[in-house]
Amino acid sequence: KKVLIVLFSVFVAGFYAQAQAQKVNVVSVSKERDIHNFYTMMKEAFPLAYNDPAAPRFIFFDDNKNFIFGVGGYVQLSGVYDFNGVEDYNFFTTSTIAMKGHQPGASYGMTVGQSRLFFKLVGNTDVGRLVSYIEMEFQGPQNTPKLQQAFVQFKGFTLGQAWSTFGDMTAVPTTIDEEGPSSGIEIRQPMLRYTYHINDRWQSSLALEYAKASYTTGKNAESIRQKVPDIPLNIRYTMKNGSHVQVGAILRNIGYKNVVKDKDKIRTGWGVMGSGKLNITSST
């Protein structure tokens, strides 16, 4: 039910913005009818992670050809033969491998849970580009759909669920499974983010993100709902050949309940990160 509510809400926001844009003399995309321009328009709407689907295979126009709507995705079949008891065939999480003597033994499995389906609405207006995007996988019970991303972008603002601002998904190397490298900050979170393009090379983002805290409470503490959002910030420099360097910081407050004193407590933490990508050749 939550997935359906989010899907409906994002599409309502997207189509409402489309209706508003048409009232302010929308620039028709019919001037960019060739396939290459449409492909580029769809692909460059926002940065992609290594396993995000790119441009859609099917594109539809509205009546006035002001906006384009794409549907795409892919089917991914993964087969695994494990010797030491991996818990999940979709995610190679080394910390979940059982200790020696407690492993269930060798096993074989297949999964299509990482297959993707997405919908993207893109349009150019006199005041900026509008993007509405929904993406889902099939990792729910019995391979039912599971929401991955759902957001609207306009005038530098991103509203919805997307990759965290603290991470740099365009710098994460390709892996077969979705767990990715151990050093990667890979998480999708509900957020309100603003990205400011300083010039052709520099840009910066600031966000408020909702994070679900996960921690061990012990006997004298209990988990509670978080009272303060995460506040991540990053700044990015992009070179002429597409290589980039990014640094970021995050301020986080984690709340818990002190059972002994029957009071809610908040602890503040922070973090910094640095990342980058170097394109050795033009096809890197």
Where are these regions (language model features)?
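An exposure/low-complexity boundary signal
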Residues: F15-A17, R129, T217, A221-D230, ...
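Flexible, surface-exposed loop regions and adjacent strand-edge segments
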Residues: D88-T94, A221-Q226, D262-K265
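Detector for outer-membrane/organellar transmembrane beta-barrel domains
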Residues: N241-T284
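Intrinsically disordered, low-complexity segments enriched in Ser/Pro/Gly/Ala and basic residues
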Residues: F8, V27-V29, G242, S282
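Bacterial Sec-dependent N-terminal signal peptides
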Residues: K1-V24
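N-terminal periplasmic/intermembrane-space "pro-region" immediately following the signal or transit peptide
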Residues: Q18-Y81
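Outer membrane beta-barrel
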Residues: D62-Y89, M99-A213, K227-V228, P232-K240, ...
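Flexible, solvent-exposed coil segments and beta strand-coil junctions
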Residues: Y50-N51, T94-K100, M169-I176, A211-T217, ...
